[in-house]
Swiss-Prot record:
GO terms for biological process: mRNA catabolic process; nucleotide metabolic process; sno(s)RNA catabolic process. Mn(2+) 4 binds at residue 160. The gene is NUDT16. Mn(2+) 1 binds at residues 84, 104. Its cofactor is Mg(2+); Mn(2+); Co(2+). Homodimer. It catalyses: a 5'-end (N(7)-methyl 5'-triphosphoguanosine)-ribonucleoside in mRNA + H2O = N(7)-methyl-GDP + a 5'-end phospho-ribonucleoside in mRNA + 2 H(+); IDP + H2O = IMP + phosphate + H(+); dIDP + H2O = dIMP + phosphate + H(+). This is U8 snoRNA-decapping enzyme. It is found in: Nucleus; Nucleus, Nucleolus; Nucleus, Nucleoplasm; Cytoplasm.
Length: 187
């Protein structure tokens, strides 16, 4: 253990580090929105994340139809994920997500903010006692380019967020490269 670099320690992250552990997909159950006010979900920890995307049919290399540009992040823990995070005391999932999008992406929430209409799904992790709310925010391709640029100036850029990426949504000639390869990349 190195006290100079922080390697192999948790520091102030110790209380929530288990939320970042990869678990089996059988650990998650989908929760209907109307059940979120009931136990065990209501008293569970909460997290909100968002897929920011733009429809895009401009061919890549003149061959592959990308269908959409979807932003993801390289997180501080080495995993790829969507922007978002834990819901703090006194916040609801939408307020927390807009805060996280501002911190992590420098998103101008006066132009683009997550609302109830952005809601997609909630899953509950049995082992973590964590509700995971997922939202989708559609923007134009030009707006997505601006969001990518602004992300470099985000408060959390370089610490909590190490960069943004777009996932490829096409499959190349060998039937493997492109989206299938992306899906096999360990997160």
């Amino acid at each position: 253990m190195s006290s100079d670099t922080g390697d192999r320690t948790w520091g102030h992250l110790a209380a929530t580090e288990h939320y970042g552990r990869i678990t089996d997909t059988t650990d998650y159950i989908q929760v209907d929105k109307e059940n979120l006010k009931n136990d065990p979900y209501y008293n569970s920890s909460q997290a909100s994340h968002c897929m920011i995307f733009a429809r895009n049919n401009k061919k890549t290399f003149g061959v592959y139809n990308p269908r959409a540009a979807i932003l993801m992040q390289m997180r501080f823990d080495g995993n790829l994920g969507f922007p978002g995070g834990l819901v703090d005391a006194g916040e609801d999932s939408i307020k927390a997500l807009n805060r996280e999008l501002t911190e992590e992406m420098n998103l101008d929430t006066s132009k683009h903010s997550v609302s109830e209409s952005s809601y997609v799904v909630t899953h509950w992790s049995i082992s973590k006692r964590l509700c995971l709310h997922f939202y989708a925010l559609e923007v134009s391709l030009a707006e997505l380019y601006e969001i990518e640029k602004r992300a470099l100036l985000a408060k959390d850029y370089g610490s909590e967020v190490l960069g943004t990426i777009r996932m490829p949504l096409y499959t190349m000639g060998d039937g493997y490269r492109g989206f299938p390869t992306f899906l096999t990349t360990p997160s």
